[in-house]
């Protein structure tokens, strides 16, 4: 079980809930990082008294350093600070809850030190899954997923001695706020509309990804990397209730599912305590009152991001980094009111069509593909 964490992305939704679980389990915090939220990170730092606090934005880091003077907490900035936080000797687990490809280098740094990775940053595996998984094997680092779907699959696979016994993975998807709408009906949807997720409380970027179904597309790629399966063996299924978090179908016809309330503290707690389970203070799922559980096929004509993700996964190389970088840039423009909802898949598809894919890429190739894809969208 985890004793001390370094938390990358402390002020986001996953980061805040991770600190709740850490407090509940008596887990120490060695490092906290964020992008630029000075007020909240100061509050968290004073409460958990980490050795290190990092703000990616240099100006914000200077302000935080002044506020924390006299506390004994070291303050760093930028990628250098993230790498330092991920590499702290006293942290046995690094929780990667930062958004986007910025989490890639710190995750690799933690892996190279053989730490447990509680992985909530799906972009790391989407962009550089083979590099990350090969490094984890080389350095003996354990990766425990925090995404509810991948945590569910991870739990269903406990006791599976041979991955060839798996016929397919079924990742469940709520369908988001626009379930049942046509592509034409989605044309005029605003950021405010997209941010009304029916079941989960998340940050704005992942909530928009859930509305476009890109989140599920990225999770398909993540599952391929985590479990070393071809894209054909990872599928998405609409499950509006968000009670069944994912399923694994085995070659003998058995189908295992993990069920629970839609609460991110469940997979966070599991990642912290694995291979054990800790008592939860929250009420468990009541099967007698949760109602009917339904399943449906996703509509890829209305939500083409799911198709684009599968196509990028099939191409391989830097295609997934292009997909991810273009999507992050397009979602950012949508949240600023500069793009329409359906322009997100249009811009992503344009980047995939126009950019050259590098096969067997280095880390530098992957990061450059990500940067170039963002530029192509702007």
Language model feature labels by segment:
Residues 1-378:
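Catalytic, metal-anchored helix/loop core of enzyme active sites in primary metabolism
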């Amino acid at each position: 079980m985890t004793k001390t964490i370094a938390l990358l992305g402390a002020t986001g939704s996953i980061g805040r809930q991770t600190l709740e679980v850490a407090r509940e389990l008596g887990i120490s915090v060695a490092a906290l990082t964020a992008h630029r939220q000075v007020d909240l990170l100061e509050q968290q730092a004073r409460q958990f008294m980490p050795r290190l606090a990092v703000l990616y934005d240099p100006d914000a880091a200077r302000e935080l350093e002044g506020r924390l003077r006299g506390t004994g907490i070291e303050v760093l900035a930028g990628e250098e600070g993230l790498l330092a936080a991920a590499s702290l000797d006293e942290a046995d687990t690094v929780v990667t809850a930062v958004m986007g490809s910025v989490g890639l280098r710190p995750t690799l740094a933690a892996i190279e030190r053989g730490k447990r990775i509680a992985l909530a940053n799906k972009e790391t595996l989407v962009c550089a899954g083979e590099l990350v998984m090969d490094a984890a094997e080389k350095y003996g680092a354990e990766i425990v997923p925090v995404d509810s779907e991948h945590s569910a699959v991870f739990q269903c696979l406990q006791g599976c001695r041979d991955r060839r016994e798996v016929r397919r993975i079924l990742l469940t998807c709520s369908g988001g706020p626009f379930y049942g709408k046509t592509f034409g009906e989605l044309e005029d949807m605003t950021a405010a509309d997209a941010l009304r997720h029916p079941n989960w409380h998340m940050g704005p970027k992942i909530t928009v990804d859930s509305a476009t179904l890109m989140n599920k597309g990225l999770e398909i790629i993540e599952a391929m990397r985590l479990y070393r399966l071809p894209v054909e063996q990872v599928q998405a299924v609409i499950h509006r209730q968000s009670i069944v978090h994912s399923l694994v179908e085995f070659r003998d016809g058995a189908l295992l599912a993990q069920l629970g309330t839609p609460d991110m503290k469940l997979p966070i707690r599991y990642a912290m305590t694995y291979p054990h389970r800790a008592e939860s203070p929250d009420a468990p799922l009541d099967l007698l009152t949760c109602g009917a559980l339904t399943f449906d096929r996703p509509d890829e004509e209305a939500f083409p991001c799911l198709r684009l993700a599968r196509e990028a996964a099939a191409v391989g190389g830097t295609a997934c980094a292009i997909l991810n970088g273009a999507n992050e840039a397009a979602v950012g423009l949508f949240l600023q009111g500069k793009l329409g909802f359906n322009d997100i898949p249009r811009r992503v598809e344009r980047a995939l069509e126009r950019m050259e894919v590098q096969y067997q890429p280095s880390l530098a190739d992957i990061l450059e593909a990500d940067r170039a894809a963002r530029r192509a969208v702007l």
